[in-house]
Amino acid sequence: VPEAVPGRQRALAAGSPVDYMSITSFPRLPEEEPSGAAESGLRARKEEDAFLGEQDTDPDSFLKSARLQRLPSSSSEMGSQDVSPLQETSKDPFSGDCSCRQDGLTVIITACLTFATGVTVALIMQIYFGDPQLFHRGAVVTDAARCTALGTHVLARRGSSVDAAIASALCAGIVNPHASGLGGGGVMLVHDIRKNRSWVIDFREVAPLGIPLEGDLQQDTKPGLLVGVPGMILGMHQAHQLHGRLPWSELLGLTADVAQNGFNVTHDLAKALSELKELNSSERFQELFLPAGQPLLPGTFVRRPDLAAVLQLLGAEGVAAFYSGNLTQEMISEVHSHGGVLVEEDFSNYSVTVEEPVHTTYRGHLVFTPPPPHAGPALISALNILEGFNITRQGSRGNFLHWMVETLKIALSLASNLGDPSGDESVTHTAEGMLSKSEANSLRQLINDSQSFLSTPPSPLASGAAASQVLVMGPDDFIVAVVSSLNRPFGSGIVTPSGILLNSQILDFSWQNKTMNHSIPRPPNLAEPGRRPRSFLLPTIVRPSEGMCGTYLSLAGNHGDRALSSIVQVLVNVLTFNKNLSESLSLGRLHPQLQSNTLQVDSEFPEEDIAFLVARGHQVDKVPVVSLVHGARRTNSFIIGLKDPRSADAAGATIL
């Protein structure tokens, strides 16, 4: 009680060698004003990364204009080399061109060929003992400032990037329990820059063995039947086994401290509570989130000793305590009391999938995102279609916006054909088509440059899912993006005696009676025992397609299928229009709603752009927010982490 006062699975070697650079300080970025506080709106928030501004695409000019401070580094000088998208390279990737000492080294090399040895030595000494140089060591971005601080703290203790992501993701389940938690699941995307390797760790929930037939599921299905087998803690443990550095018990102990010592209620949590309907009416839920019958207010100080005890237990006894212990029995009993069918075998059978991401090349970069049952192939398809259009800064704004809308319609329609490939082999074939550049060329021909077309999938896509986002770029040269969820806010609303809030992920399956229009479900996403539902949890990582130097990005979004639309637009802003990350996250976004054939645009969308769209036949619907997208960017040795400026709670920290 709060005190308010193998198939797809692959076996990978545990552990990962980490070459740690020195971290001298962890400055806190200034807290941002809540949404709407600034007189000029969200565009004023672009100043958050003003120290880079356009320089995050031109680090050399930044170096020349700043007094630089050199920090010790354990990496050798850096260089570039050509590597295939998913091939490992043993050569030190940072041995030349990527070094921010590039200009100095050029001078040294020239001097070595021109002057005597003594002059050369003098020049080398000047570089090493003259004006110091600045390196950014990492970045952490999460939906809550408390969790961002925890992530940077883990890096300060020389934890790996994955360690920081684990602690931050578990923290998010404490501070924003409506969006994620131990009773949910998600997906993690990990990229090793040095080895040019990527892993998707899929810990999405699965349907229980006793799930009713599709025809027996109704709109008013009992909340217990909406609960899938949680995967959150096993997913974090698998990630730690592969890429962790600090002890598991230490990571969970640090997270438990957040619950035990307390935190302030976020605006997002308070908003979710204020919008609650009668679904969440159990006595235990009321005690936790609606004390005295009133929702918690922003800033209210809350402690969660119940979750602290659970995390300490999992840290000491491992994940077996969750999947074959007293916690298991609690979850089963609570689900049964709410009409569910979970049994012990569901927990003992649960496993995490480790696989490679799907990827494409776009504007000289590789883009990685999760494979099915996640909608990554649909995101890739959108980029492949857009790449064939003549999109430039000087081109027609109206054409670009129209192409974007029509492309997203196609991508979202394709996504309705995805599901768990382990239960339907056709999904693999479908996904391969979405990844094809030639197929994208054919789909591009379907777009009429002057007129909108109507497209409605036979079953609705997940559009309102709450989710937590964590992005980490650490000094070990790993990039990590995690998106976790309970599905709709507060999941099923079922809370165990230990304080675990359970998910409602069965809603992400397709079943005919889920909606009022009784749309026919697609077979690839039917609810069947042991299957994972289709997902729009889309952590996305970008790196240069050739060599090691250039722009690296990490992005994640929330709000179901709207995350796909928003991530695509941010990628185009950065990679096509060469905008800096701050501006790319701030710009207005759009999302086509296929069921209603309307086009949602957020409050930052310019009226001039709306006029362009209306002229092409689009029916525009203004909404406050389409999706929140956070980002982290690395350009050579410069790293910055930024939250979506629409969020009053999220925080990005750049580590020097």
Model-identified regions with their sequence ranges:
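Short beta-strand scaffold segments in enzyme catalytic cores
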Residues: S180-D192, S468-M473, P539-I541, L628-T635, ...
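Active-site rim segments in enzyme catalytic domains, especially the processed small/beta chain
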Residues: V175-H178, V187-H191, K195, W199, ...
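Short, small/polar residue-rich loop motifs at catalytic or cofactor-binding pockets
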Residues: V354, G464-A467, S535-L537
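Internal maturation/activation junctions in enzymes
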Residues: F285, A292-G293, G340, F389-L486, ...
